Amino acid sequence: YQREPTKEEVIKTLRDTGVEILANSLPVGSEKATHFYVECALEAGCAFVNNIPVFIASDPEWAKKFENAGLPIIGDDIKAQAGATIIHRVLVDLFKKRGVKLDRTYQLNTGGNTDFLNMLNHHRLASKKESKTEAVQSVTAQRFAKENIHVGPSDYVPWQKDNKVCFMRIEGRLFGDVPMNLELRLSVEDSPNSAAVAIDAIRCAKLALDRGIGGVLHEPSSYYCKHPTYQFSDDKAY
């Protein structure tokens, strides 16, 4: 058993080691732990990059605290470089622009890393499902009815290890009410896929620190995260 550090000890470590940016990649559902480290970052004078779906940057109270402290924050819930959510968003946005009326969709994900193992606990999964679902809903021409959209982790397959597989289906109607559907299978290595975007988010936080910009960085949050304060299309955010 290893004793957990106190808040004062964490703050002292952050200050003594010269940490400028604290990136949060705790397990999904770690709400209390995330709040603990956010408070530590604020008191230690660190910028914060929130890679998980515990809502901090998109929470007005937390956002105000970072603004008052003059510290930048990016969040919430990082989008992978070429992951299921970004591809789902781009396709839904494309169909909207092409006038396709969408009826229903699903995104089912399996993986074998500890992230997927952790999400077998459905009590920890609620914020993740909300984040991923809203990322897709926000780019639709007309929001899907609740029963017509399912987006979220589906199961833990140990032998997949860090490989993540997504099965996606989108159903809609073309000109003349003619039905269409699209099915897609995506296979990626989960950790490096997310790390690519997390690194860019950290770079943006550092630029903001150097320029004395505090509060939520809305542009990188909208481009890099699934649950930002403001949801823009990826083209606009870019």
Language-model features and meaning:
Residues Y1-A47, I56-F66, E183-Y238:
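Metallocofactor- and cofactor-centric catalytic cores in central/energy metabolism, strongly enriched
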Residues I78, A82-G214, H218:
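Active-site-lining helix/loop region of Rossmann-like oxidoreductase modules
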